[in-house]
Every structure is written in structure tokens, then in C-alpha cells.
Design a protein with these regions (language model features):
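Solvent-exposed, flexible loop/coil residues
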Residues: 23, 50, 56-60, 70, ...
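Charged, often Cys/His-bearing segments associated with DNA-binding zinc-finger transcription factors
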Residues: 1-46
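Short acidic (Asp/Glu) and glycine-rich catalytic loops that position anionic groups and cofactors
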Residues: 19, 52-54, 115-116
């Protein structure tokens, strides 16, 4: 019998666009080749739902989570911008570039900053705690977002607080 004190079944991104879809209405405002445009075009490949299934209870157990494709894109942008959880939640709510990158609608209210803590903790406890840092590295390679900067540290050091592994 399956028991879970922290049960969430996996939530999935709805691929059908809403009337107020940020990419459809304002995607032209996001510079081509930017990390935002890259995430908008490739987030489903970078963060496939199957790659996060290990974080959740079996289907039908618990309430649905926020979609992994969206939350992984948010955590990636948070690292690249060096934002706090509150700043990240505000960017998701108010910044059109972020809405386009994560696949949100323009009127999407976002979520509480504690959702980021929850996701980081789930990822940190998983068998693949570096999946976000791996994605950050790929975004940096593909977009050159750090091009021209002297320091190019994109390793687990910058994610120490974000995705620290715990010892049992």
C-alpha cells in the first residue's frame, strides 16, 4: 500500500494556448536568441514531464502539482538572474519575458514564493539533485547568456543553496 505524508501527483503543462497566452500576444517583444526565447522554444525538451515523475506520488494520489516544465524553467531563470524567491515570484507575476519563457498567460497571477522552496527541496531529496544545474548549463551554452563576462561559474557552487543535497 502506498503511503505519503506529502502527496502530490504530477501536474502537467497544458499545451493548448489560452486567449491571453503571453507568447502569442507578446512573444515578439522577447529578443530572439535570448534565454527567454530559448526557454519558450525548448522548455518541454529541457524539462520533460517524464524527467520529474520521480518527485511525485502515483497518478490519482494527492492533488496536482505546478507543472514541472514551468517550475524548472522558473528555477533556471532564478539562478541565471540571481533572484531571491520573492523577486522570482514577482518576475513570474509581472515580467512579460518570464511569462513567455515559462509558458504562462499574461493574466497568470503566479504563485507564492514558498513554492520555489518546496520544489528545490523535492529536487534536492531526489536521486538526480543536479537536474536544474544541468539545464542551466545547457541554456548558457545554447544562448551564450554569459558571453563577455569574465566569470563563467555554472556549476553546483551557484546552486548550493538552491539544490543542496541532504545527507540522511
Amino acid at each position: 500500500m502506498f503511503e505519503c505524508n506529502d502527496c502530490l501527483m504530477q501536474g502537467f503543462e497544458q499545451m493548448n494556448r489560452q486567449l491571453t497566452d503571453a507568447e502569442a500576444l507578446a512573444g515578439h517583444l522577447v529578443p530572439a536568441g535570448s534565454m527567454f526565447a530559448f526557454l519558450a522554444a525548448h522548455r518541454a525538451e529541457l524539462f520533460p514531464d517524464a524527467g520529474y515523475a520521480d518527485l511525485f506520488a502515483p497518478p490519482g494520489v494527492g492533488r496536482p502539482s505546478l507543472p514541472a516544465t514551468r517550475m524548472a524553467a522558473v528555477l533556471t531563470l532564478q539562478v541565471l538572474h540571481d533572484y531571491s524567491d520573492r523577486e522570482t515570484a514577482e518576475a513570474v507575476r509581472f515580467d512579460v519575458r518570464w511569462k513567455v519563457a515559462i509558458g504562462a498567460s499574461l493574466d497568470d497571477p503566479g504563485y507564492d514564493p514558498s513554492s520555489l522552496v518546496y520544489w528545490r527541496n523535492r529536487i534536492a531529496r531526489s536521486e538526480r539533485p543536479h537536474r536544474i544545474s544541468d539545464a542551466v548549463s545547457k541554456v548558457v551554452r545554447e544562448t551564450g547568456v554569459l558571453k563577455g563576462r569574465r566569470r563563467r561559474a555554472v556549476d553546483s557552487t551557484i546552486l548550493a543553496d538552491a539544490v543542496a543535497t541532504r545527507t540522511p
